[in-house]
Amino acid sequence: MHCPFCSTEETKVIDSRLVSEGYQVRRRRECGNCHERFTTFETAELIIPKVIKNDGTREPFNEEKLRRGIQHALEKRPVSENDVEKAISYIIHRLRSTGEREVPSKLVGTLVMEELKKLDKVAYIRFASVYLSFDDINQFSKEIEKLRD
């Protein structure tokens, strides 16, 4: 690896540790030329499948779009940012673990609803009302009854 200070290729790893719950390796490196130390992070390159939308079009998975949708449902709800990030990471993990190159948008929506149901029931109903296209109050009532069971 090139030294970020002097650009020489002569660097060595002096310490390695697992971080991010074992999904990343943190390495301390030292340059053999200028003796500066620097840190690198190594992660496995895992491909997130493309999303097949309801109209049949395909688009790359968009983590920001996922985050915005979840945050919008959780607006003014008592859920920590850390819990939101854990939910997003779990959804991405589930998508990767399908082993598929493409997944239907319905799967993404279902995973979001599962996570919101765990985080906050009100946010779940908010998201479900849009995602499932509730037309009237009866659909809200039915979904709320399902939560009570």
UniProtKB/Swiss-Prot annotation:
Disulfide cysteine pairs (residue numbers): none
User: How many and how are cofactors bound here?
Assistant: Binds 1 zinc ion.
- Supply the PANTHER family for this chain: TRANSCRIPTIONAL REPRESSOR NRDR (PTHR30455:SF2)
The task this protein performs is described as: Negatively regulates transcription of bacterial ribonucleotide reductase nrd genes and operons by binding to NrdR-boxes.
UniProtKB keywords: ATP-binding, DNA-binding, Metal-binding, Nucleotide-binding, Repressor, Transcription, Transcription regulation, Zinc, Zinc-finger
* Record flagged with keyword Nucleotide-binding: yes
Report the domain of life of the source organism: Bacteria
Q: Name one GO biological process term.
A: negative regulation of DNA-templated transcription
Q: Which cofactor does it need?
A: Zn(2+)
Name the protein family: Belongs to the NrdR family.
The protein's GO terms of the molecular function aspect are: ATP binding; DNA binding; zinc ion binding
* Zn-finger region bounds: unnamed: 3-34
Protein name (Swiss-Prot/TrEMBL): Transcriptional repressor NrdR
Domain ATP-cone: residue ranges: 49-139
